[in-house]
Regions:
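Positively charged n-region of N-terminal signal peptides that target proteins for export
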Residues: 1-4
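N-terminal signal peptide c-region/cleavage motif recognized by signal peptidases
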Residues: 14-16
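Exported/periplasmic ABC-transporter solute-binding proteins
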Residues: 20-138
Length: 138
């Protein structure tokens, strides 16, 4: 019985660790879909505009959040310390502005609902009908 409990706990942790992150936007956003490369370019500060030329405002979770770790690992294969070091170099050199920090998935959704140029990421399990999914990150 004890072995079964350990096995089930491991399975649950594994399932939670592999949860899919989604990139969302305002339902009236002109952007319907972004490729993985386009999301990388936006979140790594390489571009500040959507492929259609419209301004993009990226939202980011707190520096130490599990959502942020899952998102960047799935998107770039990099760990949070690597992402933080990357941004520290860009900011120090004055070459880019990092995504706007927010405190929670609820704040991502609330900000997106007020700004048609904003995009953010949340866990797929937190998806609500009031936003549009424009990319998947596994």
């Amino acid at each position: 019985m004890k072995y079964l409990m350990v096995l089930l706990s491991s399975l649950i942790i594994t399932l939670n660790a592999s949860a899919e992150m989604i990139v969302i936007s305002h339902p009236e956003s002109e952007v319907d879909r972004l490729s993985k490369k386009q999301v990388i370019d936006l979140y790594m500060g390489r571009v500040q505009h959507f492929p259609n030329g419209g301004k993009a405002s990226t939202l980011d979770m707190p520096t130490d959040s599990d959502h942020r770790a899952k998102f960047y690992k799935g998107l770039t294969g990099k760990t949070l310390p690597q992402i933080n070091a990357y941004w520290a170099r860009l900011i120090f050199a004055g070459r880019a502005t990092p995504p706007q920090p927010v405190e929670s998935s609820q704040e991502v959704i609330a900000t997106i609902m007020k700004d048609t140029t904003a995009i953010g990421y949340i866990d797929k399990s937190e998806l609500v009908d009031s936003v549009k999914v424009i990319a998947h990150v596994e």
